[in-house]
């Protein structure tokens, strides 16, 4: 098993991609993609793996996952039971930092946003205090079209860049691509850890 290179479906004429997940459980494989991912968990519990760290997630959490950063939302075991009626619900915004926004980042006024995008390589989570502020911006982005969507998207990034209480996941920035061998090793470690996390080491 290796890290799956996931391709986010692109819509012609769209610079950012909005995706709503309503499923029995989250996508159960460690994967990565070239887009930065902003995820708002509306319902569902489990363990999130970003880079070289993991922690529980719950409804109300908001994460920013860097481009090409291996990650996994692992739903709790009860979601996989045959008679389970549990569902997950999440809203996602994807954008390629090497795409349209790379042109905008050349402007000096975009310095803080550029710095924030760089920090996403560590995998970050909004604090409980700041998350509600971001939800309002999130909804503006996904509920608008064309120019208004882009304006609200930049506004959201600026708001994120101004926050100071982000929780960092990784101790190292994941700016490089893993080889298949490295991905295999990481999957083995994660699989063992998550299968035996209740046991004493």
What are the language-model segments listed below?
Residues 3-8, 69-136:
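A hydrophobic/aromatic-rich effector-binding and dimerization subdomain
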Residues 1-63:
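Generic protein-terminus/edge-of-domain signal
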Residues 56-74, 153-160:
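Conserved long hydrophobic alpha-helices within structured protein cores
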Residues 14, 109, 130-137, 149-152, ...:
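Alpha-helical structural motif
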């Amino acid at each position: 098993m290796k890290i799956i290179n996931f391709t986010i479906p692109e819509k012609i004429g769209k610079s950012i991609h909005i995706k709503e997940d309503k499923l029995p459980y989250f996508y159960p494989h460690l994967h990565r993609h070239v887009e930065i991912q902003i995820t708002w968990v509306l319902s569902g519990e489990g363990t999130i793996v970003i880079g070289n760290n993991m922690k529980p997630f719950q409804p109300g959490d908001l994460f920013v996952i860097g481009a090409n950063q291996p990650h996994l939302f692992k739903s709790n075991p009860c979601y996989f039971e045959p008679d389970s009626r549990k569902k997950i619900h999440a809203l996602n915004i994807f954008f390629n930092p090497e795409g349209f926004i790379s042109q905008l980042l050349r402007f000096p006024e975009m310095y803080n946003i550029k710095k924030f995008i760089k920090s996403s390589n560590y995998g970050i989570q909004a604090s409980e205090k700041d998350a509600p502020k971001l939800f309002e911006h999130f909804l503006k982005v996904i509920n608008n079209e064309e120019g208004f969507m882009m304006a609200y998207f930049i506004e959201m990034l600026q708001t994120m860049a101004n926050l100071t209480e982000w929780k960092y996941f990784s101790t190292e920035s994941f700016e490089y691509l893993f080889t298949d061998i490295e991905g295999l090793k990481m999957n083995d470690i994660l699989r063992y850890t998550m299968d035996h996390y209740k046991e004493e080491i």
